[in-house]
Regions:
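Charged, amphipathic alpha-helical segments and their flanking helix caps
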Residues: 1-37, 41, 50-165
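Beta-strand-rich binding-surface signature
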Residues: 44
Length: 165
């Protein structure tokens, strides 16, 4: 099964944010929307794609080139209170780590923080603090090769991908 570049981008962000576990800032970084562990283990991060927009870079044919923008969400779960200070401190660390490699290891052309939502909700009698940072991740693929990231279309004629161009 092919791995869509979108999935590879989420995985690369999870790997990069793993440094925050090593530093003791969060207890875990997981891909997906659902909390993978009891709230007592917070703070932790959930990383997932929220939506994606695509546009043609070229018109028609099998070799249609797509410009894609993925909204990558990094959700911070702070635990049994809705302490904005803790969420803001972790958000600053997340922003620093993600900005340190805006191509996510070469998968993306660029990425930037496009929005932050700070919230709290109740699960039973426990209030849980949350913040969601949304990063816009810009990348290119061929329409026929959504698993191959960031092709340099001007050099692809001399590469293994020449047959699909």
């Amino acid at each position: 099964m092919l791995l869509h570049v979108r999935r590879a981008i989420v995985d690369a962000a999870v790997d990069a944010l793993g440094d925050l576990v090593t530093l003791g800032i969060v207890t875990a970084v997981k891909s997906g929307r659902q909390a993978p562990m009891p709230i007592a283990t917070a703070p932790y991060l959930l990383v997932y794609g929220r939506q994606e927009r695509s546009a043609n870079l070229t018109i028609g044919g099998r070799a249609r080139k797509l410009d894609r923008e993925l909204i990558l969400a990094v959700e911070i779960v702070t635990g049994e209170d809705d302490n904005d200070e803790e969420a803001d401190a972790i958000a600053a660390d997340v922003e620093f780590v993600i900005a340190d490699d805006p191509t996510l290891g070469g998968l993306a052309k660029d990425l930037w923080l496009s929005g932050t939502t700070i919230d709290a909700n109740a699960e039973g009698e426990i209030r849980i603090g949350r913040a969601r940072l949304e990063f816009t991740v810009s990348y290119h693929t061929l329409a026929t090769a959504p698993d191959i990231p960031k092709l340099d279309f001007t050099r692809a004629r001399n590469s293994q991908y020449a047959a699909i161009l």
